[in-house]
Amino acid sequence: MKIQSMFQKDINRDINGVIKVSQDDQQSLKQELSEYIITKELRRHFATFFDNYVKAIDNPTDKIGVWISGFFGSGKSHFLKMLSYLLSNKEVDGKHAFDYFADKFDDPMMYATVQKCVRIPTESILFNIDIEGPINKDKTAVLRVFAKVFYNHCGFYGEDLKVAKLERFIDKQGKTEAFRAAFKEVNGDEWVNARDSAAFFEDDVVEALQSVLGMSETAARNWKNSEVDPYFLCFQTGSF
């Protein structure tokens, strides 16, 4: 018998040496979920997280921050990615994330705790703050990153918080589709394709706002000149 035949999986398969947030294709996700090993140390960390998480289900709390620390290469990103998959319980290759962990939790109590947690409908937003962050590292940089990825996740244009704020306002009026149709009629292009250049199509945006929301021209033009407060935008996330 050859040594390579003693292993359950093909030892010549491609294995990612570094786990990256951006690697979210189905094949990579399936490999990460199916081949993730819960060591004794990781079992303790999973237990700590989910024991506290499950408490908040029965007794809601605002103490929701979690700090994951460790040396470079210790598996922080991998652990965080697994938590993200489990909480959202996303479907990968026809199988939910929790099902990939069915035989990884050898403690029945821990298994039941995690199962209770993943039953709560949850959306996870996984991102690398260094990649998503702005070049200008001022005191609002972190807030702007969180606002950006959150609004992108909601379908708004988080790359430009003024545009995202405008889209959020239109959406609250229930006029998103009507606005997009009105914009296309005057501009000729789809709003989602043109919104990254919205500042150059101010007249078209204004005309669409007037048509759909019945705003005056002055009020419609104010969106471009309005200030964007990242503190307020982050506070607004609680209304979603």
Regions found by a protein language model. Name each.
Residues 1-37, 186-199, 236-239:
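Low-complexity, highly charged intrinsically disordered N-terminal segments
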Residues 31-59, 102-105:
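N-terminal pre-Walker A segment at the start of P-loop NTPase domains
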Residues 48-55, 83-89, 150, 240:
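Short, well-ordered amphipathic alpha-helices
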Residues 49-57, 108-116, 238-240:
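Structured alpha-helical segments in the cores of large, soluble enzyme domains
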Residues 63:
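Short coil/loop residues immediately preceding or within conserved phosphate-binding loops
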Residues 66-71, 80-203:
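P-loop NTPase motor core
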Residues 76:
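Conserved lysine of the Walker
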Residues 206-240:
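Conserved helicase/translocase P-loop NTPase motor core
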